[in-house]
Amino acid sequence: MLEYINEIKAWWEETADSEWYQSRRTEEMIRSVLEKPESAFAPQVFGLLEKRMGGFAGKKVLVPSAGDCHAAYALAVLGAEVTASDISIRQMMHGWRIAEAHGLEMDFVQADTMQLEPFGGEEFDLVYTSNGVHSWIDKPEKMYANIARVLKSGGLSVMWDIHPFQRPFSGERFVQPEIIKAYDDVSPQGDNHWRVMDLVNAMAKSGLCIEEMLEMSDISYFYAFGEEKEARAADWRQNPMAALPTHICIAARKG
């Protein structure tokens, strides 16, 4: 277990300085998030957050596996007291530097999302995990037990990630995709491709009560680059993968 975590940490320390992550930290990109914070979220997810939170001002929010920190910056702009955490110290250093440069008052903490060990019980009103987190988690029940632990009574957990229905397919756009694995094969080649029931059961076991689930096919948000911006990407007759939801969002509350 410790070896697995150390491997992930080493990979992310290197990846934090990759060309792709640098592209997520340009002044233009950061300015767009600060000026339009809702753009850091899929539109339906932001609507769910607004509805379920009833506003963000003064709310204590944890963003584990914060990565590029866009969601964390956005929530801070909206008035939340935000803590961003990540297993990568480099990611947190980059996040802190950008927040300081733009006058954002936020906390940045190095932490394993499965453990959330720096945080005490009942600290946060919201814990939000963004796209890509769950594929790095080898024990979702452990992650959600700790999310429930750090949430205040009545606090909300919201996850948004690639829909598990996408995982069995090769995923090429505009061609008939191949089936490359079984839906039940949750750990192919080191990735953790959890099923819908794995996510729901982990939340239920932790004592979280699911309030709402979204299954989204907002192709324009998922396929953000190049030819995939074309309107035809949303037509399943031309792009077969568009017949399936691209993302899933689940809101669950601590009783």
Where are the language model's segments positioned?
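Residues lining the SAM
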Residues: T129-N131, W160
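Conserved class I S-adenosyl-L-methionine
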Residues: M1-A57, H70, L156-V186
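Core SAM-dependent methyltransferase catalytic element
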Residues: S206-L208, K229-G255
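Class I SAM-dependent methyltransferase SAM/SAH-binding core
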Residues: K60-Q115
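Short alpha-helix
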Residues: G190-M213
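A short glycine-rich, Lys/Arg-flanked "PGG" loop and its adjoining helix->strand segment in the class I
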Residues: E141-L156
